[in-house]
A protein has these predicted regions:
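Phosphate/nucleotide-binding beta-alpha loop and adjacent structural elements of enzyme active sites
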Residues: 1-186
Length: 186
Protein backbone atom coordinates (compact mmCIF):
# COMPACT_ATOMS: atom_id res chain seq x y z
CA UNK A 1 0.00 0.00 0.00
CA UNK A 2 2.84 2.41 0.82
CA UNK A 3 4.22 2.03 -2.70
CA UNK A 4 0.82 2.79 -4.23
CA UNK A 5 0.50 5.90 -2.06
CA UNK A 6 3.97 7.09 -3.05
CA UNK A 7 3.16 6.64 -6.74
CA UNK A 8 -0.25 8.29 -6.65
CA UNK A 9 0.10 11.07 -4.07
CA UNK A 10 0.98 14.72 -4.55
CA UNK A 11 4.68 15.60 -4.28
CA UNK A 12 4.23 17.16 -0.84
CA UNK A 13 2.78 13.95 0.67
CA UNK A 14 5.14 11.94 2.88
CA UNK A 15 4.31 8.28 3.47
CA UNK A 16 5.42 6.82 6.82
CA UNK A 17 5.28 3.04 7.18
CA UNK A 18 4.35 3.05 10.87
CA UNK A 19 1.38 2.55 13.15
CA UNK A 20 0.57 5.58 15.28
CA UNK A 21 0.05 5.00 18.98
CA UNK A 22 0.90 6.46 22.39
CA UNK A 23 4.38 4.88 22.47
CA UNK A 24 7.33 3.99 20.30
CA UNK A 25 8.08 0.33 19.76
CA UNK A 26 6.44 -2.49 17.84
CA UNK A 27 2.94 -3.89 17.51
CA UNK A 28 1.23 -6.69 15.62
CA UNK A 29 -0.97 -5.40 12.80
CA UNK A 30 -3.81 -7.89 12.44
CA UNK A 31 -5.53 -7.95 9.05
CA UNK A 32 -8.72 -10.03 8.90
CA UNK A 33 -8.96 -12.44 5.98
CA UNK A 34 -12.32 -12.68 4.26
CA UNK A 35 -13.56 -14.94 1.50
CA UNK A 36 -12.21 -12.47 -1.07
CA UNK A 37 -8.84 -12.04 0.67
CA UNK A 38 -7.45 -9.44 3.06
CA UNK A 39 -9.90 -6.91 4.52
CA UNK A 40 -7.41 -4.03 4.86
CA UNK A 41 -10.08 -1.56 5.96
CA UNK A 42 -10.53 -3.50 9.21
CA UNK A 43 -6.84 -4.06 9.98
CA UNK A 44 -5.90 -2.97 13.49
CA UNK A 45 -3.27 -3.17 16.18
CA UNK A 46 -6.13 -3.61 18.68
CA UNK A 47 -6.24 -7.42 19.09
CA UNK A 48 -9.77 -7.59 20.51
CA UNK A 49 -11.13 -5.94 17.36
CA UNK A 50 -10.28 -8.73 14.95
CA UNK A 51 -10.68 -11.73 17.25
CA UNK A 52 -14.03 -12.51 15.64
CA UNK A 53 -12.39 -13.01 12.23
CA UNK A 54 -11.87 -16.63 11.19
CA UNK A 55 -8.27 -15.87 10.31
CA UNK A 56 -5.89 -12.91 10.35
CA UNK A 57 -2.61 -12.07 8.72
CA UNK A 58 -0.16 -10.81 11.33
CA UNK A 59 2.61 -8.35 10.53
CA UNK A 60 4.97 -6.75 13.04
CA UNK A 61 5.03 -2.98 12.50
CA UNK A 62 6.89 -0.12 14.17
CA UNK A 63 4.82 2.23 16.33
CA UNK A 64 5.42 5.92 16.94
CA UNK A 65 3.76 8.91 18.56
CA UNK A 66 2.32 11.52 16.20
CA UNK A 67 4.12 14.13 18.32
CA UNK A 68 7.44 12.61 17.20
CA UNK A 69 6.48 12.02 13.57
CA UNK A 70 5.12 15.50 12.78
CA UNK A 71 6.80 18.50 14.34
CA UNK A 72 5.50 21.07 11.83
CA UNK A 73 2.34 23.09 12.31
CA UNK A 74 -0.75 21.33 10.98
CA UNK A 75 -4.32 22.54 10.51
CA UNK A 76 -6.18 19.25 10.08
CA UNK A 77 -5.75 15.67 11.34
CA UNK A 78 -7.77 12.63 10.18
CA UNK A 79 -7.70 9.56 12.44
CA UNK A 80 -9.08 6.23 11.20
CA UNK A 81 -7.38 3.48 13.20
CA UNK A 82 -10.06 0.86 13.95
CA UNK A 83 -10.32 1.06 17.74
CA UNK A 84 -6.93 2.62 18.51
CA UNK A 85 -8.16 6.25 18.48
CA UNK A 86 -7.53 7.12 22.11
CA UNK A 87 -3.95 5.81 21.99
CA UNK A 88 -3.23 7.86 18.86
CA UNK A 89 -4.71 10.96 20.50
CA UNK A 90 -2.61 10.48 23.64
CA UNK A 91 0.42 10.32 21.35
CA UNK A 92 -0.60 13.62 19.74
CA UNK A 93 -1.15 15.84 22.79
CA UNK A 94 1.88 18.01 21.99
CA UNK A 95 0.72 18.56 18.41
CA UNK A 96 -2.79 19.34 19.65
CA UNK A 97 -1.52 21.91 22.15
CA UNK A 98 0.97 23.43 19.70
CA UNK A 99 -1.13 23.64 16.52
CA UNK A 100 -4.74 23.30 17.74
CA UNK A 101 -5.77 21.57 14.52
CA UNK A 102 -9.26 20.49 13.54
CA UNK A 103 -9.67 16.72 13.91
CA UNK A 104 -11.84 14.27 12.02
CA UNK A 105 -11.93 11.03 14.01
CA UNK A 106 -13.62 7.80 13.04
CA UNK A 107 -14.75 6.04 16.23
CA UNK A 108 -17.04 3.07 16.69
CA UNK A 109 -18.13 1.33 19.85
CA UNK A 110 -18.14 -1.99 17.96
CA UNK A 111 -14.35 -1.61 17.59
CA UNK A 112 -13.67 -0.71 21.22
CA UNK A 113 -16.17 -0.49 24.08
CA UNK A 114 -17.02 3.15 24.83
CA UNK A 115 -14.78 4.36 21.98
CA UNK A 116 -17.03 7.30 21.14
CA UNK A 117 -17.46 8.41 24.75
CA UNK A 118 -13.72 8.28 25.47
CA UNK A 119 -12.88 10.29 22.34
CA UNK A 120 -15.58 12.85 23.17
CA UNK A 121 -14.20 13.18 26.72
CA UNK A 122 -10.61 13.54 25.46
CA UNK A 123 -11.59 16.55 23.36
CA UNK A 124 -13.97 18.01 25.95
CA UNK A 125 -11.10 18.09 28.48
CA UNK A 126 -9.13 20.15 25.95
CA UNK A 127 -12.01 22.58 25.28
CA UNK A 128 -12.73 21.30 21.78
CA UNK A 129 -16.30 21.23 20.47
CA UNK A 130 -17.45 18.14 18.59
CA UNK A 131 -20.01 17.54 15.85
CA UNK A 132 -21.27 14.81 13.57
CA UNK A 133 -23.37 14.98 10.43
CA UNK A 134 -26.54 12.92 10.34
CA UNK A 135 -28.88 13.05 7.36
CA UNK A 136 -27.41 16.42 6.35
CA UNK A 137 -27.81 17.95 9.81
CA UNK A 138 -24.88 19.15 11.92
CA UNK A 139 -25.34 17.74 15.42
CA UNK A 140 -23.26 18.38 18.59
CA UNK A 141 -21.62 15.20 19.94
CA UNK A 142 -23.49 15.72 23.21
CA UNK A 143 -26.58 14.48 21.32
CA UNK A 144 -24.88 11.32 20.05
CA UNK A 145 -26.55 8.07 21.10
CA UNK A 146 -24.65 4.96 19.98
CA UNK A 147 -27.79 2.85 20.31
CA UNK A 148 -29.40 4.95 17.59
CA UNK A 149 -26.51 6.16 15.45
CA UNK A 150 -24.32 3.03 15.58
CA UNK A 151 -26.93 0.31 15.26
CA UNK A 152 -24.95 -2.63 13.86
CA UNK A 153 -28.03 -3.91 12.01
CA UNK A 154 -27.41 -0.98 9.64
CA UNK A 155 -24.15 -2.57 8.46
CA UNK A 156 -23.28 -5.12 5.81
CA UNK A 157 -20.86 -7.94 6.75
CA UNK A 158 -17.93 -6.02 5.19
CA UNK A 159 -18.72 -2.89 7.25
CA UNK A 160 -20.52 -1.04 4.47
CA UNK A 161 -23.92 0.58 5.01
CA UNK A 162 -27.20 -1.03 4.09
CA UNK A 163 -29.17 1.03 1.61
CA UNK A 164 -31.34 3.60 3.34
CA UNK A 165 -29.79 3.01 6.77
CA UNK A 166 -27.83 5.62 8.70
CA UNK A 167 -24.68 4.83 10.67
CA UNK A 168 -22.51 7.58 12.17
CA UNK A 169 -18.84 6.99 12.88
CA UNK A 170 -17.10 10.23 11.82
CA UNK A 171 -16.77 13.09 14.28
CA UNK A 172 -15.31 16.58 13.79
CA UNK A 173 -13.58 18.38 16.66
CA UNK A 174 -12.77 22.10 16.65
CA UNK A 175 -10.57 24.02 19.10
CA UNK A 176 -12.17 26.77 21.18
CA UNK A 177 -12.32 29.98 19.18
CA UNK A 178 -13.06 28.15 15.91
CA UNK A 179 -16.74 27.99 14.99
CA UNK A 180 -17.15 24.38 13.94
CA UNK A 181 -20.83 24.83 13.22
CA UNK A 182 -20.07 27.61 10.71
CA UNK A 183 -17.23 25.64 9.09
CA UNK A 184 -19.36 22.53 8.62
CA UNK A 185 -22.34 24.56 7.40
CA UNK A 186 -20.40 26.25 4.62
Amino acid sequence: MADVLRQTSAPNVMVHEIALSDHEGKADLLTPQGEQGAVHGLASIEPQLVLSAKSCAIQSVPTARLDEVIREEVAFVKIDVEGHELSVLHGAVGLLERSQPVFLVEAENRHRASATESVFEFFHEREYSGFFVEDGDIVPVEQFDAGIFQDESSLLPDGGRKRGRAYVNNFFFFPSGKDGWAVLSS
